[in-house]
């Protein structure tokens, strides 16, 4: 069998694609691990994060922490984990299940010096001042700090004490070097095995007595703890000792739990805010109801009455009525192609692509096929589905372009394939340079960039062309009415129908429909918390679709009645302007985090812009098609001589 170059290239690209797809979907409740008594287990370390900087780092980038004796081994990570800055690695924090409870162990070995110099102490002090939290994993469960909400994962790297007259910068910083680990387990009496159903850490600070000529020979037992139970300060002041003796120690205790293995994630998603979600949904449903009544009045009462009038016998009374109604008077211009038709068709294609990605992801999430245990699975699913939805982008972009009487559909296809992905990739690449300069774990390695580019040009672009090809072969739908050769002049508009004002007014209601849920999403995103209430989010998405469609229909009808036939772009921008409010809110939300660093602000501005751009394409496309079907319906229902 002869294999040509095209088959080899396709096989390579398909392998890259499958490598990122593998594992993002799972069936809840599968693949538990049964621990036997005495079985050795190990904790895996991940990243450290801060809500005040938004710049994650690898755990082993912390100065003074002990690396594993066997060397650092990275877990295989999916695309979403890499983009989110997760770097899961092995550690020497081990345990023998149910047999070593309460025993204090030392991590430091002969190769891991307990002496931390002044320069490294300054780094630790900075991390504690910025309230960095440490993220670990055990049996796929993220660690949570004892006494904290489970939705707020990780444990404190250290803490500060503020004396009177001190600021955060001058406060004493203490390092949490001793960890009290609690493993919750559910026993299976039939085979004397157990499953881990919970993982907590209570971090404390211990100033151990200095051991001279350290050789790592303390054994497993912790050395003597100071009689006054002093805490380990990492704050370095002039005239004081410029180094610290730091031992990393831990102890494990085991607690039986009635929680079943397939319910162990429930505690991470418990929320006291369900009433807020329901209030938001009910409030949005009231808006939808009001808009639905308005649309019904327009279609049933006004339009049907007008259509019956126009299709009746042409009397002088009818002619007078026709002159009073504006939307029929612009029938010769209403299907005139808009300005910049290619740009609008590209926006529509991108909007359909984002809509498809969002809807399919939400369906999988609601059905439970996106695993919370698979870190980065949701982000990977979004990227993969965005790539696969490129075919819809090509099809609908070309379809709209041919409706606009466009001829160069191949050029339109190229713009569709490169515009939205290119903007996102360009912003991401620019931000990544700063993250790489900061040595953050969120900096994407070259290999991942190569994979993204391969997926873009090897899968997404061909799918766009494939969709465009199918669309170009379909006949162009005929307009219900003929377009005049000379454009009709638009009369002066009343103040509230000013294009800029009406567009800005139209975006308020779609934004209002998602406002509350947006707050929870941003809190989850920037506070490194869990967000998994996709049932509420799916309802909000449906409300957003209906709201965007109905507000666009209402505003479009008012525009046509005002004899303004430039409705193509306005139908897209009316609902799409909600993204402006989203961007303003997202940027202002950052002030709540108290961030002042340039890179952190750049991250917020860039990611808020990407999110708002996608939201504009999504809502704008919904508004466009709603108005398009309305206009075709009403003008195909009347007879024009």
Curated annotation (Swiss-Prot):
Membrane-protein topology: Multi-pass membrane protein
SUPFAM superfamilies given in the database record: MFS general substrate transporter
GO cellular component terms, A-Z: early phagosome; membrane; plasma membrane
Family: Belongs to the nonaspanin (TM9SF) (TC 9.A.2) family.
Transmembrane parts of this sequence: 280-300, 350-370, 375-395, 414-434, 446-466, 503-523, 533-553, 579-599, 609-629
Domain of life (superkingdom): Eukaryota
Any one GO BP annotation for this protein: protein stabilization
Protein name: Putative phagocytic receptor 1a
Pfam families in the cross-refs: EMP70
Known role: Involved in adhesion, phagocytosis of hydrophilic particles and intracellular killing of bacteria. Associates with proteins harboring glycine-rich transmembrane domains and ensures their efficient localization to the cell surface.
Annotated localization: Membrane
Keyword field contains Transmembrane: yes
Gene name, Swiss-Prot/TrEMBL: phg1a
GO MF annotation terms: transmembrane signaling receptor activity
Extracellular side, ranges: 24-279, 371-374, 435-445, 524-532, 600-608
Alphabetical keyword list: Membrane, Receptor, Signal, Transmembrane, Transmembrane helix
Signal peptide positions (record): 1-23
Disulfide bonds: none
Organism expressing this protein natively: Dictyostelium discoideum (Social amoeba)
Cytoplasmic side: 301-349, 396-413, 467-502, 554-578, 630-641
